[in-house]
Protein backbone atom coordinates (compact mmCIF):
# COMPACT_ATOMS: atom_id res chain seq x y z
CA UNK A 1 0.00 0.00 0.00
CA UNK A 2 1.12 3.57 -0.66
CA UNK A 3 1.29 6.21 2.04
CA UNK A 4 -1.79 8.41 2.38
CA UNK A 5 0.15 10.83 4.59
CA UNK A 6 3.94 11.14 4.73
CA UNK A 7 5.65 13.61 7.06
CA UNK A 8 9.43 13.98 7.08
CA UNK A 9 11.66 16.14 9.29
CA UNK A 10 8.78 18.33 10.45
CA UNK A 11 9.55 21.12 12.89
CA UNK A 12 7.13 23.68 14.30
CA UNK A 13 8.09 26.71 16.36
CA UNK A 14 5.96 29.50 17.80
CA UNK A 15 8.27 32.35 18.81
CA UNK A 16 10.89 30.59 20.97
CA UNK A 17 8.74 27.55 21.75
CA UNK A 18 9.32 24.36 19.78
CA UNK A 19 6.20 22.22 19.38
CA UNK A 20 7.66 19.62 16.99
CA UNK A 21 11.26 18.75 16.20
CA UNK A 22 12.35 16.25 13.53
CA UNK A 23 8.92 14.61 13.51
CA UNK A 24 8.40 11.74 11.07
CA UNK A 25 5.14 9.90 10.41
CA UNK A 26 3.92 7.69 7.58
CA UNK A 27 0.27 6.62 7.43
CA UNK A 28 -0.64 3.89 4.96
CA UNK A 29 -3.80 4.04 2.88
CA UNK A 30 -6.76 2.42 4.63
CA UNK A 31 -5.43 2.91 8.17
CA UNK A 32 -7.45 4.46 11.01
CA UNK A 33 -4.85 6.35 13.03
CA UNK A 34 -5.33 8.19 16.32
CA UNK A 35 -2.97 11.02 17.29
CA UNK A 36 -2.65 11.17 21.07
CA UNK A 37 -0.49 13.17 23.44
CA UNK A 38 -0.53 15.35 26.48
CA UNK A 39 -1.72 18.94 26.61
CA UNK A 40 0.60 21.09 24.49
CA UNK A 41 2.14 18.11 22.70
CA UNK A 42 1.13 19.53 19.31
CA UNK A 43 -1.38 16.93 18.15
CA UNK A 44 -4.01 19.47 17.03
CA UNK A 45 -1.26 21.61 15.50
CA UNK A 46 -0.10 18.58 13.53
CA UNK A 47 -3.63 17.90 12.30
CA UNK A 48 -4.00 21.55 11.23
CA UNK A 49 -0.77 21.19 9.27
CA UNK A 50 -2.09 18.04 7.54
CA UNK A 51 -5.22 20.00 6.60
CA UNK A 52 -3.07 22.78 5.17
CA UNK A 53 -4.18 25.47 7.61
CA UNK A 54 -0.74 25.94 9.16
CA UNK A 55 2.72 25.93 7.61
CA UNK A 56 5.45 24.05 9.49
CA UNK A 57 8.69 25.84 10.27
CA UNK A 58 10.49 23.25 8.19
CA UNK A 59 9.97 19.75 6.86
CA UNK A 60 7.75 18.16 4.23
CA UNK A 61 4.15 16.95 4.30
CA UNK A 62 2.90 14.80 1.43
CA UNK A 63 -0.79 13.89 1.24
CA UNK A 64 -2.07 11.23 -1.18
CA UNK A 65 1.33 11.17 -2.84
CA UNK A 66 1.59 14.93 -3.48
CA UNK A 67 3.30 17.79 -1.62
CA UNK A 68 0.67 19.56 0.48
CA UNK A 69 2.22 23.00 0.10
CA UNK A 70 3.54 24.60 -3.08
CA UNK A 71 2.62 24.29 -6.73
CA UNK A 72 0.16 27.16 -6.74
CA UNK A 73 -3.34 27.79 -5.38
CA UNK A 74 -5.20 25.74 -8.01
CA UNK A 75 -3.11 22.62 -7.41
CA UNK A 76 -3.47 23.00 -3.64
CA UNK A 77 -7.26 23.39 -3.95
CA UNK A 78 -7.48 20.30 -6.16
CA UNK A 79 -5.53 18.26 -3.62
CA UNK A 80 -7.62 19.47 -0.69
CA UNK A 81 -10.80 18.35 -2.44
CA UNK A 82 -9.49 14.82 -2.01
CA UNK A 83 -9.73 14.93 1.77
CA UNK A 84 -12.53 15.77 4.19
CA UNK A 85 -12.22 17.52 7.54
CA UNK A 86 -14.40 17.37 10.64
CA UNK A 87 -13.59 20.08 13.17
CA UNK A 88 -14.25 19.63 16.89
CA UNK A 89 -17.34 21.86 17.08
CA UNK A 90 -18.69 20.83 13.68
CA UNK A 91 -18.17 24.33 12.19
CA UNK A 92 -21.55 24.40 10.46
CA UNK A 93 -22.70 27.66 8.87
CA UNK A 94 -25.33 28.87 11.33
CA UNK A 95 -27.32 30.77 8.67
CA UNK A 96 -27.52 27.73 6.37
CA UNK A 97 -29.92 24.80 6.65
CA UNK A 98 -28.55 21.28 7.02
CA UNK A 99 -29.15 20.81 3.29
CA UNK A 100 -27.21 23.94 2.34
CA UNK A 101 -24.34 23.10 4.69
CA UNK A 102 -23.84 19.73 3.00
CA UNK A 103 -24.42 21.22 -0.45
CA UNK A 104 -21.86 23.99 0.07
CA UNK A 105 -18.73 22.13 -1.16
CA UNK A 106 -20.72 20.64 -4.05
CA UNK A 107 -21.90 24.07 -5.19
CA UNK A 108 -18.36 25.43 -4.91
CA UNK A 109 -17.33 23.04 -7.68
CA UNK A 110 -19.68 24.89 -10.10
CA UNK A 111 -20.04 21.68 -12.12
CA UNK A 112 -23.26 20.13 -10.81
CA UNK A 113 -26.90 21.04 -11.40
CA UNK A 114 -29.25 21.44 -8.44
CA UNK A 115 -31.02 18.12 -9.06
CA UNK A 116 -27.71 16.26 -8.84
CA UNK A 117 -26.72 18.24 -5.74
CA UNK A 118 -30.03 17.36 -4.09
CA UNK A 119 -29.52 13.66 -4.78
CA UNK A 120 -25.98 13.77 -3.39
CA UNK A 121 -27.02 15.65 -0.25
CA UNK A 122 -29.76 13.11 0.47
CA UNK A 123 -27.30 10.28 -0.11
CA UNK A 124 -24.81 11.77 2.35
CA UNK A 125 -27.57 12.28 4.94
CA UNK A 126 -28.48 8.62 4.62
CA UNK A 127 -24.83 7.61 4.96
CA UNK A 128 -24.62 9.32 8.37
CA UNK A 129 -27.95 7.82 9.46
CA UNK A 130 -30.04 11.00 9.28
CA UNK A 131 -33.48 11.30 7.67
CA UNK A 132 -34.53 13.43 4.66
CA UNK A 133 -36.61 15.68 6.93
CA UNK A 134 -33.44 16.65 8.81
CA UNK A 135 -32.21 18.41 5.66
CA UNK A 136 -34.50 21.37 6.33
CA UNK A 137 -33.51 22.00 9.94
CA UNK A 138 -31.19 24.81 10.98
CA UNK A 139 -28.03 24.11 13.03
CA UNK A 140 -29.60 25.75 16.11
CA UNK A 141 -32.29 23.05 16.03
CA UNK A 142 -29.82 20.15 16.13
CA UNK A 143 -28.50 18.16 19.06
CA UNK A 144 -24.74 17.86 19.54
CA UNK A 145 -24.75 14.39 18.02
CA UNK A 146 -26.70 15.56 14.97
CA UNK A 147 -24.31 18.47 14.44
CA UNK A 148 -21.43 15.97 14.32
CA UNK A 149 -23.29 13.82 11.80
CA UNK A 150 -24.16 16.76 9.54
CA UNK A 151 -20.54 17.95 9.66
CA UNK A 152 -19.42 14.42 8.81
CA UNK A 153 -21.86 14.31 5.87
CA UNK A 154 -20.43 17.61 4.61
CA UNK A 155 -16.87 16.30 4.96
CA UNK A 156 -17.87 13.31 2.78
CA UNK A 157 -19.66 15.40 0.14
CA UNK A 158 -16.80 15.31 -2.38
CA UNK A 159 -16.10 11.60 -1.81
CA UNK A 160 -12.68 12.06 -0.21
CA UNK A 161 -9.94 9.46 0.07
CA UNK A 162 -8.72 10.81 3.41
CA UNK A 163 -10.75 11.94 6.43
CA UNK A 164 -9.21 14.15 9.15
CA UNK A 165 -11.10 14.45 12.44
CA UNK A 166 -10.42 16.72 15.41
CA UNK A 167 -11.84 15.28 18.66
CA UNK A 168 -14.82 13.70 16.85
CA UNK A 169 -16.63 12.57 20.02
CA UNK A 170 -15.95 15.65 22.19
CA UNK A 171 -19.11 16.85 23.92
CA UNK A 172 -21.10 13.67 23.26
CA UNK A 173 -22.55 11.48 25.99
CA UNK A 174 -21.24 7.86 26.11
CA UNK A 175 -24.09 6.35 24.07
CA UNK A 176 -23.89 8.96 21.29
CA UNK A 177 -20.10 8.72 21.35
CA UNK A 178 -20.19 4.93 20.90
CA UNK A 179 -22.73 5.29 18.08
CA UNK A 180 -20.61 7.91 16.29
CA UNK A 181 -17.48 5.76 16.63
CA UNK A 182 -19.31 2.80 15.08
CA UNK A 183 -20.51 5.04 12.23
CA UNK A 184 -16.99 6.31 11.45
CA UNK A 185 -15.58 2.78 11.61
CA UNK A 186 -18.29 1.48 9.25
CA UNK A 187 -17.86 4.34 6.77
CA UNK A 188 -14.09 3.95 6.85
CA UNK A 189 -14.42 0.28 5.95
CA UNK A 190 -17.20 0.63 3.35
CA UNK A 191 -15.72 3.67 1.58
CA UNK A 192 -12.08 2.56 1.82
CA UNK A 193 -11.11 5.74 3.67
CA UNK A 194 -7.90 6.56 5.44
CA UNK A 195 -8.90 8.19 8.74
CA UNK A 196 -6.66 10.33 10.96
CA UNK A 197 -8.09 11.69 14.18
CA UNK A 198 -6.96 13.63 17.22
CA UNK A 199 -8.50 12.32 20.41
CA UNK A 200 -7.93 12.28 24.15
CA UNK A 201 -10.79 9.83 24.65
CA UNK A 202 -9.56 6.28 25.19
CA UNK A 203 -12.91 4.74 24.26
CA UNK A 204 -12.75 6.47 20.88
CA UNK A 205 -9.11 5.51 20.43
CA UNK A 206 -9.69 1.82 21.17
CA UNK A 207 -12.92 1.67 19.18
CA UNK A 208 -11.49 3.17 16.00
CA UNK A 209 -7.74 2.83 15.71
CA UNK A 210 -5.74 0.36 13.68
CA UNK A 211 -2.66 2.28 14.86
CA UNK A 212 -1.85 4.94 17.42
CA UNK A 213 0.71 7.75 17.01
CA UNK A 214 1.92 8.99 20.40
CA UNK A 215 3.23 12.57 20.44
CA UNK A 216 5.68 13.37 23.23
CA UNK A 217 9.08 15.04 23.51
CA UNK A 218 8.34 17.09 20.34
CA UNK A 219 8.14 13.99 18.12
CA UNK A 220 6.29 10.77 17.40
CA UNK A 221 7.40 8.73 20.38
CA UNK A 222 5.60 5.56 19.25
CA UNK A 223 3.57 4.50 16.23
CA UNK A 224 2.03 1.05 16.29
CA UNK A 225 -1.05 -0.95 17.23
CA UNK A 226 -2.52 -0.23 20.66
CA UNK A 227 -1.30 -3.56 22.03
CA UNK A 228 2.25 -2.91 20.80
CA UNK A 229 2.29 0.64 22.18
CA UNK A 230 1.18 -0.63 25.59
CA UNK A 231 4.31 -2.80 25.76
CA UNK A 232 6.64 0.21 25.43
CA UNK A 233 8.26 1.15 28.72
CA UNK A 234 8.11 4.96 28.77
CA UNK A 235 6.79 7.28 31.52
CA UNK A 236 4.29 9.07 29.27
CA UNK A 237 2.88 5.84 27.88
CA UNK A 238 2.54 4.37 31.37
CA UNK A 239 0.75 7.47 32.64
CA UNK A 240 -1.51 7.87 29.60
CA UNK A 241 -2.47 4.28 28.87
CA UNK A 242 -1.84 2.21 31.96
CA UNK A 243 -3.65 4.01 34.77
CA UNK A 244 -6.50 2.01 36.30
CA UNK A 245 -9.11 4.20 34.56
CA UNK A 246 -7.33 3.97 31.21
CA UNK A 247 -7.07 0.19 31.35
CA UNK A 248 -10.79 -0.10 32.13
CA UNK A 249 -11.68 2.22 29.24
CA UNK A 250 -9.51 0.32 26.76
CA UNK A 251 -10.89 -3.06 27.82
CA UNK A 252 -14.48 -1.79 27.61
CA UNK A 253 -13.97 -0.25 24.17
CA UNK A 254 -12.33 -3.40 22.83
CA UNK A 255 -15.31 -5.47 23.98
CA UNK A 256 -17.68 -3.10 22.14
CA UNK A 257 -15.57 -3.29 19.00
CA UNK A 258 -15.39 -7.11 18.92
Label each residue range with its predicted role.
Residues 67, 115-133:
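Conserved ABC ATPase "signature" region
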Residues 36-38:
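The feature captures the beta-strand-to-loop junction immediately N-terminal to the Walker
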Amino acid sequence: MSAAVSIRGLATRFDEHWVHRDLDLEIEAGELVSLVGGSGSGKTTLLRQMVGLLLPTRGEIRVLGEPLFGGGPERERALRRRFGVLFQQGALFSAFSVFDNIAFPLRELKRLDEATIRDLVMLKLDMVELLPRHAYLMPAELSGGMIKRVALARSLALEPELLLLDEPTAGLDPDRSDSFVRLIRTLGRELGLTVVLVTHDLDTLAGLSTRVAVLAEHRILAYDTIDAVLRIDHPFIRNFFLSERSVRALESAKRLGD
